[in-house]
């Protein structure tokens, strides 16, 4: 985990003492810089904790969704019948129409 890789805490940075020499760093400048680092470090730590909580929450929600999905009863897929042409009625209608047309065109000559 990332927590194992972090070696310093904000408190460690705050309490760090630097040795000063005759021509060493200006102590005030180092303190100001360390204060900025501490603030950033605390902000990163806070963000990290929030992300860990969010990650745990999302994992729980995912597990709940998986569990709910397995518990949903499987409903059979109902296929709607495809409209099939009705040949019997169509053929009968065509034959009747043809007969009527023949009677109209040829009259009674056809049936004599």
Curated annotation (Swiss-Prot):
One of its GO terms (biological process) is regulation of cell shape. Keywords: Cell cycle, Cell division, Cell shape, Coiled coil, Cytoplasm. It is found in: Cytoplasm. GO terms for cellular component: cytoplasm. The keyword Coiled coil applies. It holds the Pfam family DivIVA. It comes from the Bacteria. Transmembrane segments: none annotated. Signal peptide: none annotated. Its main location: cytoplasm. Residues 38-72 form a coiled coil. Belongs to the GpsB family. Divisome component that associates with the complex late in its assembly, after the Z-ring is formed, and is dependent on DivIC and PBP2B for its recruitment to the divisome. Together with EzrA, is a key component of the system that regulates PBP1 localization during cell cycle progression. Its main role could be the removal of PBP1 from the cell pole after pole maturation is completed. Also contributes to the recruitment of PBP1 to the division complex. Not essential for septum formation. NCBIfam families: DivI1A_domain (TIGR03544), PRK14127.1 (NF010725). Forms polymers through the coiled coil domains. Interacts with PBP1, MreC and EzrA. This is Cell cycle protein GpsB. It comes from Bacillus anthracis. The lineage of its organism: Bacteria, Bacillati, Bacillota, Bacilli, Bacillales. The gene is gpsB.
């Amino acid at each position: 985990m990332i927590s194992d890789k972090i070696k310093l805490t904000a408190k460690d940075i705050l309490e760090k003492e630097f040795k000063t020499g005759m021509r060493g760093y200006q102590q005030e400048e180092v303190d100001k810089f360390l204060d900025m680092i501490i603030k950033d470090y605390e902000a990163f730590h806070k963000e990290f904790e929030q992300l860990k909580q969010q990650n745990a929450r999302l994992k729980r929600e995912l597990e709940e969704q998986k569990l709910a999905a397995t518990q949903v009863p499987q409903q059979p897929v109902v296929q709607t019948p495809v409209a099939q042409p009705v040949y019997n009625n169509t053929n009968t209608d065509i034959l009747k129409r043809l007969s009527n047309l023949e009677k109209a065109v040829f009259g009674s000559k056809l049936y004599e």
